[in-house]
């Protein structure tokens, strides 16, 4: 099933204050009701004809325990509108002849600024009550890449990752060094208080209290290793194909709630959370990062296509629903191939996601 979405009028802007999340979501939706949209929440992309489309775009806002019965109508509406708005950012760039890289960077930037998602403004808190942000971006035409990890005062980590790719001889910068590079290259830096959201803070406090009660004073250290305790793998990502046949991918995250020791997941790791090459596909992942790193998930999809000749659908499905499941990994990915085919597989209860091609546009949450 396909449909052409009508253009969204007005500038949509996420905001967050100190009130309860239910009140915020109602206010958030009130601002957005003036925007026309035409969205559906169930569908899978249709395989394209051999003719490559003018563009293709896919996004995600994280995967995990996302259940319809736990989602209020207001909250679901807010997520759907946010996803559709993000699609509009990237699709507008691609429709006007822009590059896949620019579409990816700008789309992820918008998602970073929306507090509904665990990236940028909506980032979760570390064990110490800080926000540590990670991001990566990759150009399928040149296979150049840029990544940053554990930055705390950079408003949009994806823009810093792009600068690392374009303005340095390196691929991966972290911590204070990455922040210094941001300052030297005009990347916007901001008071870390800007990242504070009451909902994320309350989740951390609840988690700390539960660990203390269950595992003692050093609860975090005594807790057995396992899956993300809140059941969600918050990440945002975008993959794109432009009119010139170039691919790009980008991913950004606040990481895992209650993380310690500058823990990094797959999002900033090229080949694990992000990968792009014009000869096959562009991939952005979301899930239990340790598993995605161990099994080089994003690169694995590309390798199955490049070396074994699998289709995008077959390669991504095998990695997510067979290999990861067998290894105990949970999550999903978005991917687009050189012909404009799109795949959005996940093995969790839900994944915030959407995609757009000429005459076709959808956003989805549940299975």
Residue ranges and their predicted role:
Residues 36-367:
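Alpha/propeptide regions of enzymes that mature by internal proteolysis
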């Amino acid at each position: 099933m396909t449909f052409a979405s009508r253009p969204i009028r007005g500038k949509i802007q996420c905001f967050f204050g100190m009130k309860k999340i239910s009140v915020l979501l109602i206010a958030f939706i009130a601002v957005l009701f003036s925007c026309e949209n035409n969205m559906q929440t169930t569908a899978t992309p249709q395989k394209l004809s051999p003719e490559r489309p003018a563009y293709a775009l896919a996004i995600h806002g994280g995967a995990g325990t996302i259940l319809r019965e736990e989602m209020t109508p207001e909250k679901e509406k807010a997520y759907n509108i946010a996803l559709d708005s993000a699609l509009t950012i990237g699709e507008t760039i691609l429709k006007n002849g822009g590059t896949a890289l620019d579409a990816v960077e700008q789309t992820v930037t918008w998602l970073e600024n929306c507090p509904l998602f665990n990236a940028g403004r909506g980032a979760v808190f570390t064990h110490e009550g800080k926000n540590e942000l990670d991001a990566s971006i990759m150009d399928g035409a040149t296979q150049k890449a840029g990544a940053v990890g554990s930055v705390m005062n950079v408003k949009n980590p994806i823009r810093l990752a792009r600068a690392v790719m374009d303005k340095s001889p390196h691929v991966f910068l972290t911590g204070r060094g990455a922040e210094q590079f941001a300052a030297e290259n005009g990347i916007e830096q901001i008071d870390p208080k800007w990242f504070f959201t009451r909902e994320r803070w309350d989740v951390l406090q609840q988690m700390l209290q539960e660990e203390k009660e269950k595992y003692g004073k050093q609860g975090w250290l005594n807790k057995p290793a396992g899956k993300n305790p809140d059941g969600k793998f918050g990440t945002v990502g975008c993959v794109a194909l432009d009119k010139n046949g170039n691919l790009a991918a980008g991913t950004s995250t606040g990481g895992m709630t209650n993380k310690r020791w500058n823990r990094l997941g797959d999002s900033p790791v090229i080949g694990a959370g992000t990968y792009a090459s014009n000869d096959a596909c562009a991939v952005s992942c979301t899930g239990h990062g340790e598993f995605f790193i161990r099994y080089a998930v994003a690169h694995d999809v590309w390798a199955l296509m490049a070396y074994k000749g699998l289709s995008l659908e077959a390669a991504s499905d095998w990695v997510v629903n067979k290999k990861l499941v067998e290894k105990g990994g949970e999550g999903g990915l978005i991917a687009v191939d050189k012909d404009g085919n799109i795949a959005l597989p996940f093995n969790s209860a839900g994944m915030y996601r959407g995609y757009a091609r000429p005459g076709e546009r959808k956003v989805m949450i549940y299975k």
